[in-house]
A protein has these predicted regions:
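Short helix-boundary/re-entrant hairpin motifs in multi-pass inner-membrane proteins
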Residues: 58, 65, 196, 200-259, ...
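Short aromatic-rich membrane-water interface segments that cap or initiate transmembrane helices
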Residues: 64-82, 195-199, 361-371
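Aromatic-capped, Gly/Pro-kinked transmembrane alpha-helices
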Residues: 426-430, 454-534
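C-terminal ends of transmembrane helices
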Residues: 14-25, 91-104, 145-160, 210-224, ...
Length: 534
């Protein structure tokens, strides 16, 4: 039971905070102080857990009817601890940076909702068997829907959200099918080989569960909520899926899986990187940030690079958490953002260095090129959004600005805490080429933007002519990734299915509607009693 302490603490603290803040009407400052202290305590507990790695919890007779022998196993491994630590660290940073967003939204709902989301995210990361993973994913969906309903002022959830949860449900069903086909009683890490069908179902299920499709639109116009609760909301599901993939042994013997998923994932990642870099602001580009890293992770997984997945996850949370939680621009936050970028590029002996470790030893030259270009573009986009000017908020008190800065600093320090237990792996992952090119690319892009060259290029007829087909392709991709085609198809199917009903209703509403009703009633009654004669 010791392994469940962080989860139980988060649940207990969320209930206490909701009670004292909602029913006792405690001041917002005092409520925040209790919240910050609570999540920091859980964060410290998780660090202690990495030092001792307590034994997991195994539930054998979980079904009172005895109709299933599948185990429920919850534990932390060396890899899954990193994902749990990233998630809880993101929660701590969210709470600390929320000091500059006091009174700009329902802070109580934001904080307790973020704690609940983190709790169910930890529950999923802890899951060590397929059945436990399936249950945890279902719980995540239920909690997210409940929080969205409480936050969104409209009476109905946007259709994009409905399709998003529908795709997640389909992903869960695919993993259920994999569980039925595999009939494996071992933990996920204990299974070294899956059949082709089971492996394919697991990859497809994880892809749909990533939660990046369809590309979401904001469900609320409240920017503070989008920065705090929205950030946790968009990271919980992907982190839980990445943790799941880090436990499933890649099956390199299925070459056709690699040949299909690797190019598709890389092209998707490249598209997401370009859209992220050209987005108007970081919140508009957030779905593309998630899409790009999801594609890179999937491509790395099918090639068998688990350490690369861990490094990509650190970059996704480190860079994404920093840029999405940063509410205003200051000299300090800009410098810290550049430090964050240097940490992300994967210099040797840094926590993110495995992001380049598999190059050029594996994969085709074209795949390695697309992978590298995608990372370069992501880093350039990150620098662009860091340097993009925002209105600096000087109206906040000094202590609010202090904790806000501490929250951003924490995000930069998180990877260095993980390296304490990963240095033996990090020191063997040395690649200078990728990081150096990344730094040069970011520097050149900054210098070019500072000149008149971009404006001259954008205004040139040759550029406009070249961008015409690119704009058409981009429009097609946007419609595909936002699932506009699905909405159109669904509407047409719905219209087709409702035609007989509309015809039937039109008949009944006519002048002879009563006679038709009696006739149909007589026919139905005769069928039920079996008295039809011919």
């Amino acid at each position: 039971m010791l392994i469940l302490v962080p989860i139980l603490l988060l649940l207990l603290f969320a209930a206490i905070i909701q009670f004292v803040g909602g029913y006792r009407h405690l001041s917002i400052g005092s409520t925040w102080l209790i919240t910050a202290g609570s999540v920091i305590l859980v964060w410290i507990t998780l660090i202690v857990f990495r030092a001792i790695l307590p034994e997991g919890l195994s539930i054998n007779d979980w079904n009172p009817l005895g109709i299933s022998s599948d185990q429920l196993v919850y534990k932390l491994s060396e890899n899954t601890w990193i994902f749990a630590f990233l998630l809880v660290s993101l929660l701590v940073a969210t709470i600390l940076t929320d000091t500059v967003r006091f009174g700009q939204g329902n802070n109580l709902t934001t904080w307790t909702g973020s704690m609940l989301l983190t709790t169910v995210g930890l529950f999923s990361i802890y899951s060590h068997t397929l059945l436990a993973v399936i249950i945890s994913w279902a719980v995540i969906d239920i909690v997210e829907i409940g929080i969205l309903i409480s936050v969104i002022k409209n009476q109905r959830i946007h259709s994009v959200a409905v399709v998003e949860f529908g795709l997640r449900f389909m992903g869960t069903m695919l993993v259920i099918a994999a569980l039925i086909l595999s009939k494996s009683q071992n933990g996920i890490e204990g299974t070294t080989q899956f059949s082709h069908a089971v492996y394919l179902l697991l990859i497809l299920g994880a892809t749909l569960r990533l939660g990046v499709l369809p590309l979401h639109v904001p469900l609320t116009a409240n920017l503070p909520i989008r920065r705090s609760l929205g950030t946790i909301l968009r990271f919980v599901t992907p982190i839980s899926v990445l943790s799941f993939l880090s436990q499933v042994q890649p099956q390199l013997q299925y070459a056709n899986v690699i040949l299909f998923f690797n190019p598709v994932a890389l092209i998707t990642a490249l598209y997401g990187a370009v859209k992220w870099t050209t987005a108007g602001n970081e919140l508009t580009g957030r779905p593309y940030w998630m899409l790009a890293f999801s594609g890179l992770v999937l491509a790395s997984y099918v090639q068998g690079h688990i350490e690369t997945i861990v490094a990509l996850s650190i970059i996704m949370v480190l860079g994404g958490g920093y840029i999405f939680l940063r509410s205003s621009t200051s000299r300090f936050s800009t410098i810290l953002g550049i430090v964050c970028l240097l940490e992300m590029v994967g210099l040797p002996f840094t926590p993110t260095s495995p992001v380049w470790s598999h190059l050029p030893a594996s994969g085709t030259a074209f795949a390695n090129f697309v992978y590298s270009i995608t990372l370069f573009i992501l880093f350039i986009g990150f620098l662009r959004h860091v340097l993009r000017s925002k209105k600096e908020d000087t109206s906040k008190e000094m202590w609010m600005q202090l904790f806000y800065s501490v929250g951003l600093i924490l995000l930069v320090l998180i990877p260095w805490i993980t390296i304490i237990w990963r240095f033996s792996v990090i020191r063997s992952q040395v690649n200078w080429v990728g990081p150096i090119i990344s730094i040069i690319a970011c520097g050149l892009s900054y210098l070019i933007v500072r000149t008149r060259v971009p404006r001259l290029i954008l205004e040139s007829p040759a550029y406009k002519k070249a961008m015409t087909p690119a704009a058409v392709v981009g429009k097609i991709l946007v419609e595909f990734f936002t699932f506009e085609w699905f909405y159109l198809l669904f509407r047409r199917i719905y219209t087709l299915l409702t035609l007989p009903i509309k015809f039937f209703v039109k008949i009944l509403e006519g002048d002879g509607g009563l006679l038709w009703s009696l006739l149909f009633l007589a026919l139905i009654a005769s069928v039920l009693v079996g008295e039809i004669t011919f």
